[in-house]
Amino acid sequence: MTNNRVKEYDYLEAVPIEHILYAQFIKYDKLNRLFTEYYKDKPVPKWINIYIDVYQALLPIFSFYKVTNPYNITACIANLAIHYKSFFRKAGIDSFVFLLYSPTTGAATQQRFCPEYNGKYTMRMINNKEVYDMVNQNIPLIQMLCQYMNNIFFKMGTVETSVMAYDMITKFKNRQITAPSLFITSSQYAFQLPSKVKDLIMLYKKKPLPGTSDDTSYLVTQQNALDSYIAEIKKQHIEKFEVNQSWLSGFMTLSGIPKRNLKSLFNYKQSLKILKSIDEQFDQATPDSLFNVGCKLYPNKGLDSHSYDEIVNRFRCIDLDYQLYMYRTMPEAIDTVFLEQVNDPEALKNINDQYFSQNPILLEKLWYQNINKNEGRVVMTLPFIFLSSNQLSHITHGSSS
């Protein structure tokens, strides 16, 4: 059913979709402050793999309806990838960029355990038929464009983008590819990712505070993943809690994920107390330990066999490792077509001129510009590739062991 707001909305007052999408870009001065601080006592890598959560980047446009050019979505997403790739290149760090999109986030592997998972935002997308259809029409164009954008790839799936990224990251590591990873998102679910991967940084995109233009986006690492998640859902400053940061899935099972429509079984203080008690007795937080310790500490909750089943299902729905296991049983997990690329700068320029004249792809940032002083002309060359598409395909198709 189409949302009545579409009919009632005053298009003259609507915000153009491209304005919403470009607001998802974190400015270079903010990025510079964040990463200068992060690398002040660490060696700066020569390569980084960047994963961008396109689902979360597109989600805000489903509250708006003004469309000036249907191709602006593709242009903005392409420029989002170039924006971050260019930032790191200026710092002497080259990169792969993986644009990850899941229009039915959680439907394949999570709603079987928790039917309500992400229901609110799924309905928001479906009810805005105009934007929903326009996004779907842009997907083939984005896929085609990325075939010509060197080292920028677009992968579509049906699971959480965090699961897609986790799959690729672990396959890289299993093949001894040790480049650090950056995951850019505004997903609460994604806080698990840095808790699981030692050298992964999550760049959490925040909306500016009301009445300000201040960008409060921040970095999340293995050392502060759980602390940062608690601060995010409680809308408070980050505190240090003496709990294993990698047990975030256990905490989420108990306290819920607000932006994924999973309500709390325990408040955050009770959830922390349960995890601390488990930490004193066990090596890991499992559904059994969560249930048993919860019963012991909070008998007034009246937990029963139904509660146990609920905790088991919530854990399977949430836990990143379990979701990775589920994902790897699906055909989409071994798809490598998205890695196929064509070295044809002239074709890319023609595509840009044909489809994106009003909102062009920033090719000058994508390509290096080498000045040949003897001939007085600019020579456009593609960046250095540290792995071929065939090698990448072999890695991402490889086994999980």
Predicted regions span which residues?
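Noncatalytic, basic helical substrate-engagement surface that gates or grips nucleic-acid strands
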Residues: 4, 8-179, 195-210, 319, ...
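Positively charged N-terminal leader segments that act as targeting/secretion signals
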Residues: 374-383, 399-400
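Nuclease catalytic cores that cleave nucleic-acid phosphodiester bonds
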Residues: 59, 128-341, 345, 385-388
